[in-house]
Amino acid sequence: MRRGITATALVAALALAATACGSDDESGGSKSSGELSGTVTWWDTSTVGSEDKVFKKIAEGFEKKHPKVDVKYVNVPFGEAQNKFKNAAQAGAGAPDVIRSEVAWTPEFADLGYLAPLDGTTALKDQDDFLDQAAASTKYKDKTYAVPQVIDSMGIFYNKKIFKEAGVEVPQNIADLKTVSKTIKDKTGKTGLYLRGDDAYWFLSFLYGEGGDLVDAKSKTVTVNNPEGVKAFKTVKDLVDSGAAKTDATDGWENMQSSFKDGKVAMMINGPWAVADTLTGKEFTDKANLGISPVPAGTAGQGAPQGGHNLAVYAGSKNLDASYAFVEYMTSVETQAQTAGELNLLPTRTSAYAKQEAADSEIVQFFKPVVETAVERPWIPETGSLFAPLVTEYTKVLTGQTTPEKAASTTGDSYRKLLKGWK
């Protein structure tokens, strides 16, 4: 998942300044007495105001289990965490003991030498229980550098009340999406779709729907500028130009969420991580008003990206034993069942889906088959860096500053500079 939330940057910055971090001596703990102790600093990147409260509460449960361990919880804005961690790790000061790493960041951090290998540690308890597609992003050069915390994909969130008022059905493909959006506008005056324009992760479903991809890692070939990529850029441009969708070049997360929660738009593309926040909106005081359906198919079929988050341990941590134990606790079956029940987040452990909390979550049950067929991103160190050049061109296309053809070509050129020796 890539959310790019930035609204809490100031709060997180203040918290970081005041928080002792993993590379500091005071983090040191000892297991010589058979009891864990010391400090574990955890950088969480979950949604502020909903997810963070639950994760902080769960982390406090670890402290109760291990009274001599102090977990310092810091919520770092998702859009800042990747570079903030790299800068701290490179400097050798200020990095946390444990970071919530977006799946694409993990191979990059491992390649840079910033993560502790976890094979043979308590962090990987019951390793065979993890879903194969969730575990794939944790491995780099035959070693395991993280533990899967949550897995996700994307779907269309829709307002059932608005759909009923307009007399429309859930769109199955892009043509349907345009027709449904026009009908909603004509009959209710509301915009059909909010298409987030400041995060290229929201572009991937359209790219995959046309049969395209960013790169082909096996052949080391850049593919974003293939005809399928151009078609995907044309598709998103047409949605905005036709009035089927509205977009913004900045503050996309906040604008998208508020527009949907307040009933100003009928649809948005989002994932399980957005459910808890969405249900706080006035339109969804009755939770049954929220509908979720697969992302509308493109000409090649329906495609949605596989996302998620891992928990990784900083290689320079002064308290590795407690950090390993914390990761094991935060990714346990019980913890994953709890987050499925309270936040509708998808577990990465097979056995967690048999727990009542996961079985009772309609959101989890909807997204589970979506995740099983979602498109994996290439697990290469550079994957996390592919989004910066892509979002620049994606935003330009949506705001009329460039053409789909030029956007695809420019993105491809940027990738070839980043991926040395690739075609």
Go through each PLM region and give its residues.
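Extracytoplasmic/periplasmic substrate-recognition and gating elements
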Residues: 60, 166, 234, 238-245, ...
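Hinge/lid segment of periplasmic solute-binding proteins
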Residues: 103-153, 178, 186, 287-292, ...
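Periplasmic solute-binding protein
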Residues: 106-114, 134-169, 196-218, 305-312, ...
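Conserved C-terminal helix/tail region of periplasmic/extracytoplasmic solute-binding proteins
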Residues: 164-166, 241, 372-423
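Glycine-centered hinge/linker elements that transmit conformational signals in sensory
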Residues: 181, 221-249
